[in-house]
Amino acid sequence: MKTRKFLFTSLLALASTVAANAQTFDVDMLKAQPVYSTENGQGYDIVAAPKAKSNAPFFYSVKVADGNYKVTVVLGSKKKAGKTVVRAENRRLMLDEVSTKKGEFKTYSFIVNKRSPYINDKMNVKIKPREKDYFTWDEKLTLEFTGAAPAVKSIKVEPASAETTTVFLCGNSTVVDQFTEPYASWGQMITRWFGPEVAISNHAESGLTAGSFLASNRLEKVLAMMKKGDYVICEFGHNDQKEKSAGSGAWYNFSFNLKKFIDEVRKKGGNIIFVTPTQRRMFDKATRSKIQETHGDYPDAMRAAAKREGVPVIELHDMTRTFFETLGYENS
């Protein structure tokens, strides 16, 4: 009996090891690589593989389960000088332009969070039709190599440490990983400023309110992926302010929904942070020098909920007003 139990335990351990190894990819980009397919689980994706002397951007995808992955890239080339920008999933900035001289190589590591709509056998995230084209809700982790002269020697993708801290972003178009140029948000740029011990998982989507974020099971997905000690950063109010239905309003429905975020995140042992809504670029018509307030009571309602519940607040509402006014009407 003990022998059988030992054998069964050994087989489970072996299966776990095989599963872990199956999520590790070590890719020599100097060798010919396949075109991505579900069957081979890795390869060039989205656009055709670059030609030998081409400076065209390219994508490389690997099939992995939901979670955090440590990506290590060696940038550079023996044949040319390089200027390489690295993005992940929906244009999530991981490395700003890296310059390498001919024959020079530089190694960088960062964490990429990958997800799918699946939560459990009875629940999925209710993504919008346009999100089906995104690189963020699929079976694969996608890397984009762009810049004036992309030069990539190797790519390694492996499961990140279980101790990796994840920062989950919840919000609207000012936070989302924007899919196409020239659109961008602070949520898809903030990844650039975190080291290889932190993952950013951006669950924001254009047009969402705090209520529609909850109704589409997006917070449920965050809660399913988070662990004790992780962070959830919420910026809402931009679209909530437009709601006119019964029960809507800064001090009623909006405040109620914010409390739900607080309670659910804390129940899982997470840390929640509020971000007051990004200002709209709406200058006064007379002088074109002062930003006009368009969010009504929503910033104050968020501040009040945060004060009452002991939630830290990032004052993006005030900072973006100063930012736009400092740049001026034309430059902003």
Labelled PLM ranges:
Residues 53-67:
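Short beta-strands within extracellular/lumenal beta-sheet-rich domains
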Residues 1-23:
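Bacterial Sec-dependent N-terminal signal peptides
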Residues 23-55, 149-159, 165-166, 173-176:
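Low-complexity, Gly/Ser/Thr/Pro- and Asn/Asp-enriched, turn/coil-prone segments
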Residues 143, 147-205, 218-232:
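Serine-esterase "nucleophile elbow" of acetyl-processing enzymes
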Residues 96-127:
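Extracellular carbohydrate recognition and processing domains
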Residues 67-74:
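A short tyrosine-centered beta-strand micro-motif
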Residues 1, 89, 217-332:
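Alpha-helical cap/lid subdomain in secreted, periplasmic
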Residues 60, 75-95:
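Short, surface-exposed beta-strand/strand-loop-strand elements in extracellular ectodomains
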